[in-house]
Amino acid sequence: KNKKKFMQSGKNITLKEAMKNADLFLGLSRGGIVDQDMVKSMAKNPIVFALANPNPEIEYDLAMRAREDVIMATGRSDHPNQVNNVLGFPYIFRGALDVRATTINEEMKLAAVKAIASLAKEQVPDVVNEAYDEKSLSFGKTQIIPKPLDPRLIYWVAPAVAKAAIE
């Protein structure tokens, strides 16, 4: 029922056709299925989340060479913007355990997402910069989510989840 509003009638189209003028590519399939021309065909400031593991749908370096305005994330730790469940699961469970929740509901997951998003915009502490051999990480194209080794995650995400669990 909820998916019907996103359905389109007509002929089947290729991934290449679907990406033309697209704002976002969200890949969760297999590596190597997106090429530089497909990224070039996207709308201005495209978002490419190539999350297939171990190899993304398009390699980070290829996407960045395709166009300078791309906002890119992968599931890999060797590139900026690693999208990985390690940012959520430990702290969602910590928050749930802290209040003895017997289930993890949508509100708790949404609270975790909002906490992670808020933390991403905060000034990055020196300990995180040092852990990643960086000088000054900050919110932007190469830092859209916190780094997995950010020690603040537990203090932001777990309490938000716990609060959502008891409300």
Predicted features and spans:
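Adenosine-phosphate binding glycine-rich loop
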Residues: 50-158, 162-165
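Short secondary-structure boundary/capping segments
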Residues: 2-3, 34, 46, 64-67
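Glycine-rich, charged/polar anion/phosphate-binding loops
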Residues: 10-13, 32-35, 58, 74-75
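Aromatic-residue hotspot detector
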Residues: 5-8, 25, 49, 89-93
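Rossmann-fold NAD(P) dinucleotide-binding segment
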Residues: 19-48
